[in-house]
Amino acid sequence: MTRTIDPNTTMAELLQEFPGAQRALFRAYHIGGCASCGFDGAETLASVCARNDNLPVDDVVNTIYAAHEADQKMQVSPGEIAERLRAGEQLPLIDVRSREEWDAVHIEGATFFTQELMQEMMSEWPKDREIIFVCHHGIRSLDAASYFAGHGFQRVRSMTGGIDAWSVEVDPDLSRYHVE
């Protein structure tokens, strides 16, 4: 169940429940993308709205909910991906984690996301090709999927829970890790 957002919700609580909120706030209102328009996790949504041209909190909340709904449509579970791979589907799993994370552990058959791969995808891959992005917990991959969707890719997905969920739900032999 999705948590209700109210004016006193802190930004940390908001981002915990709605990971795409920062992306949505930046896209719609230029909030949270840089030092001059950033916010502190302890600030409430109401205070952030107040210092950004007194934005109506209800409008901002609706923007976050709409973005969250769009994000949910891009999600695909580790179990569904595993089933499809076992059935022989050729799914591009694009891992957007850091090189260190990739070197430590990665899903067999996944491809490490590089600048060169991004250029290839943007210029050569069909816009209707299904692409599944993977990261540690499913947040960076959701940002990547959203970015590619914004550039016209129609079938981008993000693996819910990332490689961490994959290691719990699909492949318990895959090491779990924590970034400090």
Residue ranges of predicted features:
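Phosphate-rich cofactor/ligand-interacting catalytic cores and adjacent structured alpha/beta frameworks
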Residues: 95
